[in-house]
């Protein structure tokens, strides 16, 4: 199942990427909210989110 595969992928992802991805995609937090919550700059949040999304997208292609 794709949801199980996504959960497994996120569990194996680096923590710094997983946290940002979950806060944005699951908790629907803004970049500003994430940056304040994690004490990071917004550019760091955007970079980590881009890397996390790239990781997810690469694996999603394998699931098709």
Feature roles, as predicted:
Residues 20-24:
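A short pre-motif secondary-structure segment
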Residues 38-62:
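DNA-recognition helix of helix-turn-helix
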Residues 32:
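Residues within the helices of the helix-turn-helix
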Residues 10-18:
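Short helix-coil-helix linker/hinge
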Residues 35:
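The alpha-helix within a helix-turn-helix
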């Amino acid at each position: 199942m794709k949801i199980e595969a996504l959960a497994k992928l996120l569990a194996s992802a680096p923590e710094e990427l997983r946290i940002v991805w979950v806060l944005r995609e699951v908790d629907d937090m803004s970049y500003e909210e994430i940056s304040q919550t994690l004490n990071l700059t917004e550019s760091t949040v955007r970079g980590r989110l881009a890397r996390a999304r790239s990781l997810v997208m690469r694996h999603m292609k394998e699931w098709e």
